[in-house]
Amino acid sequence: MASLIYRQLLSNSYVTNISDEVSEIGARKTTNVTVNSGPFAQTGYAPVNWGHGELSDSTLVQPTLDGPYQPTTFNLPINYWMLIAPTQAGRVAEGTNTTNRWFACVLVEPSVQSTRREYVLDGQTVQLQVSNDSSTLWKFILFIKLEKNGTYSQYSTLSTSNKLCAWMKREGRVYWYTGTTPNASESYYLTINNDNSHVSCDAEFYLLPRSQTDLCDQYINNGLPPVQNTRNVVPVSITSREIRYTKAQMNEDIVVSKTSLWKEMQYNRDIIIRFKFANSIVKSGGLGYKLSEISFKPMNYQYTYTRDGEEINSHTTCSVNGVNDFSYNGGTLPTDFSISRFEVIKENSKVYIDYWDDSQAFRNMVYVRSLSANLNDAVCSGGDYTFALPVGAWPVMSGGAVTLSSEGVTLSTQFTDYLSLNSLRFRFRLTVSEPSFSISRTRLSGIYGLPAANPNNNVEYYEIAGRFSLISLVLTNDDYQTPIANSVTVRQDLERQLGELREEFNALSQEIALSQLIDLATLPLDMFSMFSGIKSTVETVKSMTTNIMKKFKTSNLANAISDLTNSMSDAASSVSRSVSVRSIGGNATSRISTAIQAGDDLRTVADASTQISSVSRSLRLREFTTQADNLSFDDISAAVLKTKLDKSTQISQSTIPDIISESSEKFIPMRTYRVIDNDTAFETGIDGHFYAYRVDTFDEVPFDVERFNKLITDSPVLSAIIDFKTLKNLNDNYGITKTQAMELLQSNPKTLKEFINNNNPIIRNRIENLIAQCRL
C-alpha cells in the first residue's frame, strides 16, 4: 500500500549525523524544547578569546581565588575577607584605626603550655600570655587594646589544622573567625571606623568578596584545595591589584589594540529594542465553530530612534521557543466551540530578539569577543480576542502576562528579502505575571502565561532599553569592510517558499482523478518511486531522502509511534469499563445530557465522547503498525501527496522534507476507525462521535465500551474510509448486498473503485471530501 512510504521513512530515520542534527535544531522555527546556543554558535569563525562558552546550569565553575599577595600594610577594602595563610608561629597581622582600637593576631603551634612570649606590636615590644593545649591543632589568638599605651587582652581564638584565618571590615565592625575547625564560624569583636583602619600582614594572603563568604567558610574549615585556582602564580604586591577605572560613555568607540593590518575596537552603545509578536489563527473546516491552531510566528519590525543626536535605523526579529500547547474541547457536536491547539509561553519558554542597526558597531561584526549587555525588564500583557461564532454568544480569550528578563546575548544573522545582516540575539527568560488568562463562557480560567491569541494587546510595540558592549577585530583601514559570514537562523526564505508551496498543494486537490487515486493508493510506494516524478530532484533523490528521514524523525507521527504501547494502554484505560452507552450521531442532541452510571462516577455522554476521541487518536498508531491489504487513510494521504508532488511546479529539494513531515501530520485530520466483532461494528472518530451498529442492517445498537476496549487490543483496526453515515445513506438510497457492505466496511480498494467507476455520487462525494482534507 502507498503508506509504505511512511513506514519506510520511520524505519530508516534513526541514523543521522550529529552535526546535521545540531544544525537542524538551531534552524527550527517552532519547537517545544529549549535550545541553549553557545555565544559563538551563529558564526563560522572562532572567537578571539577562547573559552568554554555557555555552561549548563548543573555545571559548577570554581571562582578564581584573588591572590596570593605579598606581606604588606594597606587599607583593607570594605566587604572583603582577608584570608591569611602563615607558615610559622609568631605574629600574623595587626591593625588599628589610630584612635581607640588596636588589634593583633598571633599564631601558636600545638602543645604549648601557658607561657609569656614577646611580640612586636604597634612598634613596641610586648609580652603576651599564650597557650595551646591541643597536640594537633594550631591556634590563632586575637588580642585587642583600647588605648595607645594600654595592654592587650585576649578576645578570641581559632583552633585549626589548616593554619588559615580571616577577617573582614564591614558595617563599622571587624569580623573574625572563631571556634574549632571544621565548625569554625564568623563573629565580630570590634567597632571601628572602617575608612581609616589599616592592616599590616606578615604572611601571604588572599582576598575574597563578601558574596563568597561560603567559600571562605570552606577554606577556613577544610583548607585550600591542593591546586587552587588563583589569580597569581606567585605572590605579588597588592599594588598590582589596583585597577585604573575610566568612566565609559554610553556611546563610544575605543581602540583597544592596533597593528598595521588589524585593530580591536570596543563599541559601547545604548540601545532601544522595540519588538512585536506575530501569530497565526487557523480555523478548521465545517460550520465555523472550531479552530485548528493559534500559534506564535516570528515577527520582523523596523523602526528609528535617536542616539546621541543621531537617528538610528533598526531592525528586530522576535521569535519564541519552548512553547506550551493547550487545547479546549467544548463538545462533540459540530456547533460546539473547540480549539485543537493554542500556544502559551510560560516560565519554561524563551523569547529571542535579534537586533541590528546601521551604526558602526554592526559593520564588522564577525570576529567578536567580550560581548555583554544590560537590559531592562519588559512586561508583555495579552489582550482580548473574540471568537466570532456564526450563532450564539461569542467566547473571548482575555488576560495573561509574562515578564521578560535578559538572560544573555549571542551573535546571529538576520535574513531579509535582499541581504543578510550580522546582528545580536538577545535571549530572555520568562516569569508569569498577573493577570491569568481565561476564555469566557467556558471552564477555562486561572491559567498563567501569555497566549498567542492577542499577545500584543493592541499596542504598536513593546520596548526594552539598555546598553551593550563588544570588542570587534576589524581592519585598520576603515574603508574596508569584513565580509559577512552567512549562518543559519529561524528567518530564511525557506519559510516563504513553504508558504507558497502549501497554497499550491491545497489548490491541486481539485485536479486529482478519483479512480487513479485509488489505484495509486494500492501501490507500494517506496522512496524512489515517491520522488522520481519530480524533475528538479530526480538526480538527487539519494541525498534528498537523507534530509527527509531526519525531518520525519521529529514529526508527531514518529514520536507517537515510539510511545505506542503507553499511549494505547493509557487511552484505553481512561474509558469507563463495564458500561454501555448509546451511540452519538449527528442528530442525537437529545442524548447528550444523558447520564452514565459507572460505579460511583457520574458522567455525561459528552465526557465519554471526549475519552473516545482520545482513544481514536491512538487507533491510527494501532493500524499503522499492522500490515493489511485494506485501504487506510495513510494510503490515501500518501497517494494524494505523490500526485501533488508530481504536479507541483514549486517543489524543491529544500522544501520537500517539511512537506513530507507536515503531510503525515495534517492530511485528513478528521479520521474514523472501526473494529468488527462478528455481526457488530464499533466505529469511533477523532471528533468524539461513536457508533455501534449491525453490519447487515446498519441498525444502531448500544455501544458496549468494555467490549470495545477488548477489541481494539486484540482485533485489527480498520480505517473507516466509508464511514457509518455514508454507508447508511448508501444503503437507504441504493441498497447494497451484505457482501458489498462487508467489503466497504473493510475498505476493500477493488469495491471502492467499482463504485467510483459507476459514478456513485455518495461514494465519490466521500472520497472527494477526504481529498479536500489533504491540506497543509
Curated annotation (Swiss-Prot):
GO terms classed as biological process: permeabilization of host organelle membrane involved in viral entry into host cell; virion attachment to host cell
Disulfide bonds: 318-380
Renumbered residue ranges of the record's region Spike body and stalk (antigen domain): 248-479
Motif (DGE motif): 308-310
Region (Hydrophobic) location: 389-409
Renumbered residue ranges of the record's region Spike head: 65-224
Keywords: Capsid protein, Coiled coil, Disulfide bond, Hemagglutinin, Host cell membrane, Host cytoplasm, Host cytoskeleton, Host endoplasmic reticulum, Host membrane, Host-virus interaction, Membrane, Outer capsid protein, Viral attachment to host cell, Viral penetration into host cytoplasm, Viral penetration via permeabilization of host membrane, Virion, Virus entry into host cell
Coiled-coil regions listed in the entry: 484-511
Motif YGL motif positions after renumbering to this chain: 448-450
Ranges where the record places region Spike foot: 510-776
Cleavage (site feature) positions: 231-232, 241-242, 247-248
GO annotation, cellular component aspect: host cell endoplasmic reticulum-Golgi intermediate compartment; host cell plasma membrane; host cell rough endoplasmic reticulum; host cytoskeleton; membrane; viral outer capsid
Additional facts recorded: This strain probably does not use sialic acid to attach to the host cell. In group A rotaviruses, VP4 defines the P serotype.
Family membership noted in the UniProt record: Belongs to the rotavirus VP4 family.
Protein name according to UniProt: Outer capsid protein VP4
Species this chain originates from: Rotavirus A (strain RVA/Rabbit/United States/ALA/XXXX/G3P11[14])
